[in-house]
Each structure stands twice: as structure tokens, then as C-alpha cells.
Amino acid sequence: MGLGLLGGGIATTKWLLKHGAKVTITDLKDKKALSSSIKTIGKHAKLARFVLGRHDEKDFKTNEIIVVNPAVPKESKFLKIARDHKAKLENEASLFFRFCENPIIAVTGTRGKTTTANWIRHILKQKYPR
């Protein structure tokens, strides 16, 4: 729900399609507004079903998983429909954590993330050389 223009929905769509998911992309923006995002999906776009410029309630009643763009308000009537029909609500981060099989190291905070990430990289390269 919400392909978006900034890349998150695009990467998630490509990953889902690559792994054989049956994908419906629905966004309130129309095809013209999303043309660059659709183009970025590339050859995989033909595997998806698009509902653009509107949402269809049936999509939220019949799909098992709804991947929600962070810009979509939590009180959206379509998310309520999905919840009422027992769909799992996911986002790109929750999908990543669900399907990533490797250990994850996360670095958060206001300052020092790049330095900390570089130190972690340095330590791991010494411990696990290729």
C-alpha cells in the first residue's frame, strides 16, 4: 500500500516479485505521478497488478499481507479493512527482519553512526577475512 517515490516501496516490490509473491501495488498517486517508480521496478513490473490513483476495498479484504508505506496514516480506513479481514500488516523493515537469515547488527542514534559502523566493519573483517 503506497508504492511511493523514494525507493522503499520499489525495493520491497522487486524483492517480493523476485521471490515469487503475488503482488498488487495500490497507491493513491496515479500512473503518471508514479511512472519513474514503476520504471525503476523494471522487468518485474509486468508480474505485478497495479491499482493506481485509488484503492479498491476488495484488495484489503482478500490479500493475506499488506505491506504498508510509512507515509500511510495508521488510521487509514483501508488498514482498518485489512485488520478486520485478518491481513498481516507489514512494512519493509519487518519483512527484512522476518526473512533475513543472517545475524543483524544495527547502529542507531543521532551522532556517530558512520564511525561506529566503520569500526564494526573493521573488527568483523579482521575476525572473518574472506
Task: Show the residue positions of the predicted features.
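Glycine-centered flexibility sites
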Residues: 2-9, 53, 71, 109-112
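ATP-dependent carboxylate-amine ligase
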Residues: 1-49, 61-66, 84-87, 118, ...
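Phosphate-binding loop of NTP-binding sites
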Residues: 15-18, 57-61, 70-130
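Conserved beta-strand termini and adjacent loop/short-helix elements that scaffold enzyme active sites
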Residues: 26, 51-55, 92
